[in-house]
């Protein structure tokens, strides 16, 4: 797949199966494993991922009202910022920026603060490119069930971190094959830009 990303749309599922000495059923199972609805969906997504999708000012506009509303609601509450792997240092940056601007922010998850009794007193911010990391999904699902307000910065719209949050902020586009270090991954850099833009808009609104 990686060797033929420029002409994937010309390869049928039978050709793909034959070239890899497997069956079409195995290809379908692979598609499902990666979260695609079928072979055509996988090919479309992989072909589209060749072009890096950057966040635009027009994309930002749709998130501003809800972002401002949530920060106003939790101005004096605890804000937990969390990410795993490459998202961890991004979460640390967001936490420090919030703290410097007077918020009660931390980047360590205390699960008791995501209990239902804190549903009006906690805001949970998560960063994840894929949105499918099991431990992160478990934490977010529990917070969602307890009616905790959640903001997610995420690339994968087909994940729980998009479905089960108060405000999902889509950053770029998700590629299941981003493990290839030769392919540029702009997600983490874009999260910083998007967050800074949203925070600036919020701070400007309360001056």
Regions found by a protein language model. Name each.
Residues 1-207:
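Conserved N-terminal alpha-helical segment that immediately precedes and caps sugar-phosphate-binding
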